[in-house]
Amino acid sequence: MVAFVRQTVFLGALVGMGLLSLPLQAEPKLQTETASAPDAFPIRFSYYPALAEKNTDGLDNAGVVILLHGDKGSRINWDKGASTAAGQPTFPAVLQEQGYAVVTVDLRKHGQSVLEGREDPIQNDDYAKMAAGDLKAVKDFLQKEHQEKKLNMGKMAIVGAGFSAPVATAFAEYDWLQKPHDDSPVPAMRTPRGQDVKAIILLSPDAAAGRLQTNKSLVFLNKQNLAFLFFVGKQDGADKGAAKNCFKACAGGTKKAEGRVELLEPDMKDRGTDLLGKAPPLIEIPMLKFLDTHLKKITVPWVDRRSRLDR
């Protein structure tokens, strides 16, 4: 009953703020996909395609949001939402209703992204493979959808939780380091191969995972003027200042970061994806407003991602 009330308040608030329209579809449209990372590791993910009826300006203007799970979690943390009342929409479903394409990922050695018949322990180098391999496979899939004008990969956001925070930021850093195709004498006219991630949300971010360091990537990404939203529960004893350090790494609190970098500290003890479903006005609604401002409403023209030399 409590969960139902929370979700009813959540939906009412979304409609009241113009972030959601009624009626909602009964079930979200989604499909399960498998992609191969560069090392052939199988990566399973759920794909919620952008809906034409929610994108009156065309699907080629639809942003895409990648959702990552936390430690010992899986994409089910997003797809099912343990604290969601029966019959009420999950966070990915709400994003889809808002017009986004959404991907929830099982990072390697989590959920269904495992080698058949094996239960391999996670090694230190796995985290870098998640960032540069698993998420590259997901992005390659999204590029195919982009080329068919089913979304605009130039309007991409990623959400990390716990250990997947450094994975998310490392992926975004790799993305921004991709140089455009050398297919025009005019640099501004060259076809992009990256620099697609425009916004990042981190829930209870870990400072590091293997050799990945969250703040190292954030310092670089902040120079690209990305938008950042950090969450940490005030009663989270495991945080040890990591979220505030992320905020500081992005020059949070300065005039340059005003309106672009934000840290929210709800009075909660939960961590990572466990923050979801407990107090939507403190977690989900700020996330949706952030994405609305820094992803949905930004102008990024759709661009053919093939090199001009191959068209």
What kind of region is each of these model predictions?
Residues 76-84, 107-130:
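Cap/lid segment of the alpha/beta-hydrolase catalytic domain
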Residues 92-116:
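Conserved alpha/beta-hydrolase
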Residues 52-97:
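Short, surface-exposed "cap/lid" segments of acyl-processing enzymes
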Residues 119-149:
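Alpha/beta-hydrolase active-site loop
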Residues 149-162:
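Alpha/beta-hydrolase fold nucleophile elbow
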